[in-house]
Amino acid sequence: MQAYLPIERPQSFFTCASGGLGHSMPAAVGIALAKAGRAPLSGVPSTQRVIGLFGDGSAMYSFQALWTAADLGLPMTIVIVNNGGYAALSEFTAHFNIKQLIGTKLPGLDFVGLARAMGCTGARVERAPNLAAALREALESSRPFLLDVAVAPLG
C-alpha cells in the first residue's frame, strides 16, 4: 500500500501509539473535518482529501463514523484491508497459549453495502492488478468513498 500512498510530508500520516481497534475511522473523520477547515460548517469547500487505511476488524468497532463523513460531505477515502477477521487479536494466541480464538472471523461482510447505507460510495477490489484504478476512482470521488481491498487471511 505504501507504493500507492507514500508518506511524503509532515502532517500527512497520523496513527495512535498503542492498540488502535476502533480508533481509526472516527480519527480519520476528525482529521478530515479539521483539514477541511470546518468546510461543511462554513460552506467553504476544501481540496484536501484524507485517506484512512485500516483493517476490517478495526472498522467494525466504529463504522457509524462514515455516516458523519457523508452527512458533512467530507473529502475522504477509507481503504479497508479486508482479511476476513480480527487478525491483530490472533497474534496473541501464542503469547497467552490459546489454542483457538473464538469470534474473530468476519466472513462475508459487505463493507461497500454498509458504506452505501451510510450515504457513501464504494467499491471492492479482489485482485491486485485492479487496485490502482480503484484507488484512483476513490481519490477522485466527490463524496466520501470506501474501498474494500480483499487480502489473504492470516494463518
Model-flagged regions — what are they?
Residues 3-155:
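Thiamine diphosphate
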